[in-house]
């Protein structure tokens, strides 16, 4: 999951922030 989150974050930092929020 970490790898997926890392890729998603790098591709879409906004989406990552939303996921974490």
Curated annotation (Swiss-Prot):
Residues 1-21 form a propeptide. It is found in: Cell inner membrane; Secreted. Its main location: membrane. It is a multi-pass membrane protein. GO terms for cellular component: extracellular region; plasma membrane. The keyword Membrane applies. Residues 1-21 are annotated as: Disordered. Propilin is the precursor of the pilus subunit, pilin, that forms conjugative pili, the filamentous surface appendages required for cell-to-cell contact during the earlier stages of bacterial conjugation, and that retract after contact is established. Mature pilin is assembled with the help of TraQ and TraX. Belongs to the TraA family. This is Pilin. The lineage of its organism: Bacteria, Pseudomonadati, Pseudomonadota, Gammaproteobacteria, Enterobacterales. The gene is traA.
